[in-house]
């Protein structure tokens, strides 16, 4: 049954006072949530940036989630993770769209670890058709679709304003082929303790960012700031100031492509005084939330 969590304290109140106290707590931003697995309520979420939009997330329940794993080809991938064996285990594999700096090593990781690759339906279908990944190691879903790939973990695909294309080196011809891959998405990843991460993938500004924030209530936002292909620092700061309400924001998708000139310093300047904690990360750094 639902419980009210207020740090680690338990208060015994007369029944007559309970309603008033509950109303006060809820109005202060504390939410009722479903019972979590044992230990998940106090465990931390570890977020490791692997460069560009690539992240490894270790959930409070000990699961390893990999998002947009551009590792062997990524110019900013930490040296250790150029070897896919360094991942050790992958319980959940998510890709936001088909561009190489997001799809990256996902097919190889799926096959190496026997992990199902979750992604937009129109990206997964051509990957299977061209033989990049077996059908039994894929799961197709789409914007507004939710899945529960692991106990206590829920993933919802949400809108991203971006394109998607798979470039595949055909071994039979030795030439690259381009395959349309539908539309890009972002992900709301809800972990065992209710902590929610919005990985925005690649996106420009769009007004429904406000709706996504209001409806899904993310705690942590991973937001692209590089510009040219995505929002630049000023765009991203506008979204965070005006549309998105979260506790933390981590800038991503910069410092890897010379065409994407947005900088951390530019984002920090544009975010000055914003009501959200900016958590700048360096490639290879892990932060607990």
Identify what each model region corresponds to.
Residues 67-68, 90-98, 118-121, 197-203, ...:
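Active-site neighborhood of phospho(di)ester-bond hydrolases with catalytic His/Asp-centered motifs
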Residues 146-176, 277-289:
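Flexible, acidic/histidine-containing loops and adjacent segments that form or flank the divalent-metal
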Residues 117, 131-149, 237-289:
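Binuclear metal-ion centers of metallo-dependent hydrolases, dominated by the metallo-beta-lactamase
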Residues 173-242:
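Active-site-proximal loop/helix segments of hydrolase catalytic cores
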Residues 73-74, 100-104, 124-127, 145-148, ...:
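Active-site environment of divalent metal-dependent phosphoester hydrolases
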Residues 39-45, 59-65, 146-156, 190-197, ...:
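Beta-strand-turn-beta hairpins that frame and shape the catalytic cleft
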Residues 59-99, 104-111, 119, 125, ...:
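Pre-active-site segment of Zn-dependent metallo-hydrolases
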Residues 6, 14-17, 21-64, 71-73, ...:
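Zn-dependent metallo-beta-lactamase
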